[in-house]
Structure formats: C-alpha cells, structure tokens
C-alpha cells in the first residue's frame, strides 16, 4: 500500500512540532550555566562554561529538608530547584520543587507553560486536580492524595493543590523543564501590569465591573 509523500511530510512536520514543545535534548554530556558571556557558549537560554572547568558544586543544591514559610495569603510555599539554583541542570530538561502547605492552605490554580509535573505527597492530605482544554470540554480530573500517592499534571493544564487536613502537608514535584515557568491564574488576570480593562474582565467572567475593580485592587502588584 503506497503512502503519499504529502502524508509523510505532514507526519514529519507534526513530529518536529512536538519535539520543539519541550526542552531540546543536549548534544553534550552537560552544559553548566554561567552568567559570563565572555567565557561561554549560549545554549538553551544560558551561557555554558568550559566543560573542563565544571565541578561537583555545579550539580548540587541543599536545603530541601527545610520547610518553606507558609505565612502568606494562600498559606503555601514553593521552594524551586531549577537551572538558577543548579547551573548543571542547563539543557537537561528537568527541575524539582518542594511545596509546603499550612492546614487548609493551597497552591492556587496555575499552569506551567513549559513542563509536565509529577507530584508525590510525603506528608498530609491533599486534594489535587487539573482541568483539560476547551476541546475536551474543560473536564476536571481530581483526586485526594495520601502520603506516597502520585499525581501527574500535563503540560500547560491549569492545576491546583489544596491541603484538606488539619496538619501541614509536604509534597515534592518533578518538572520536565530546566525552567518550567509558572502562571498563577488569579495573579495574572487580575494583577497584570498594566491592568486589563475591567470592562473586558467583567464581560469575560460575567461579573459586575465593580467586583472586577475590587479584585484588581486585591491582586495589584
């Protein structure tokens, strides 16, 4: 059965598009990031030091045994270990976070534009979930997690975690990017700089414009 050349080209184009949606694969053993452009080569958003000058400290970080401060409006804290903390992560397409939650605290709805996330709960009880895209009718996928449970948040999906217990909770998550990025929905929509016209948001969210103005005042940077 013959396969048309156009079908082959379409398939190859799709594969290239998918490949570009993630951090590119490294073409060397490692590429330790440095801030000095005079002595480095620019790769994947960072300058790389001479591999012969790399040392163990370039691949090391400490402190994830320490709880983050959760005394804030959402009662949670995210401690990030990405390429900015471990320069040796540059080009390796992976990073890590520790998330601490006060009782009833939450990691509010947000998205990672460049990474899938896999989360494991170490302590406490969490209610977690993500919402699929418009094409999938915005379905909610949610579970209650206990210690040792694992949940995956696909790349780009809006997701959240809420501590539903009376005691603190701790989770660790791996991300499929050296710098996953984060877009917190409420902060982004109601706290942008400059602010979005409240009339636009009032129509989009079907709210009174004064409610929108109040929300923008709360989330103003």
From Swiss-Prot:
It holds the Pfam family Cupin_1. Keywords: Apoplast, Disulfide bond, Glycoprotein, Manganese, Metal-binding, Secreted, Signal. It is found in: Secreted, Extracellular space, Apoplast. SUPFAM superfamilies: RmlC-like cupins. May play a role in plant defense. Probably has no oxalate oxidase activity even if the active site is conserved. The keyword Transmembrane does not apply. Glycans are attached at residue 77. This is Germin-like protein subfamily 1 member 17. Belongs to the germin family. The lineage of its organism: Eukaryota, Viridiplantae, Streptophyta, Embryophyta, Tracheophyta. Oligomer (believed to be a pentamer but probably hexamer). Disulfide bonds join 31-48. GO terms for cellular component: apoplast. InterPro entries: Cupin_1, Germin, Germin_Mn-BS, RmlC-like_jellyroll, RmlC_Cupin_sf.
